Curated annotation (Swiss-Prot):
CoA binds at residues 44, 83-88, 105-108, 178-182. The gene is aasdhppt. This is L-aminoadipate-semialdehyde dehydrogenase-phosphopantetheinyl transferase. Coiled coil: none annotated. The keyword Nuclease does not apply.
Amino acid sequence: MKLSALKRCVMGSVRWAFQCGSWCPSQAEWLLCARCVQPEEKQRIGHFMFTRDAKAAMAGRLLMRKVIADKLQIPWDRILLERTGKGKPFLTGGSSSEYPCFNFNVSHQGDYAVLAAEPDRQVGVDIMKTDLPGSSSIEEFFRLMNRQFTEKEWNSIRSMNNDWARLDMFYRHWALKESFIKAIGVGLGFNLQRIEFEVSPVTMEIGKIYKETKMFLDDEEETWTFEEILLDNQHHVAIALGEVDHLQHQSPKIGDVAESTFTLLNFEDLMVSAIPMSDEDPDYWINFQSKQELPFRQRRSR
């Protein structure tokens, strides 16, 4: 199909965040959410052992459907999402061929679920919460994770002046690596030693977007752009942005029109475009209510 025959979404970059950690859904809210996702996703979310994980997964699915409904103007109940063999969600069905360059990705960890979407670029997003490791010391934790980073990256992590700053730099590097892996959709089989990040600046301010970090793949500097932002003093978000091959020489890019920052959505924002796709299932609420929010060990550590 020729490019001129394809639709390009009239949108800029999208950055949304939802505080799923503090979200305490009512019975009506949770049952409405269950009606607004695909049956297989409803079932998958219902199998989580803890409500924290179920809420995060539900928020992620709703964010994906919202961005497609709002930005591509596809009715919510006509959106069909599938996963690649490596687990990356994508839009399928008749509408997907009309917007072949539209990309989106979600991540949830800590207190937030986040979404990044682009009209004409590859995108991967990851969020990491800086927190103390469970039962091991920071040094033991770093030892166990030694193979995930290059020597230069470990030098950057260990150069920080206290344990918390070192842990924070660790999770910053981790989010960067995960954002790239998610953008290219290769899953867990990718050797993380092949990619190396040169982070800049060392210190970040909350709410400010940074684009100075560089990535090297097999020792060669790449042209990918990495956006970084601190949502608060514990949550670091990294967004990997790469060119779609057949659009590399087109200018200007829609996604470069405006600076992108994260918009914090509330539950009403999240559901404003939602259209239920199934009947209400009261047992789904009973199942949700029967679960603990967190594992016992994590509840004690708070």
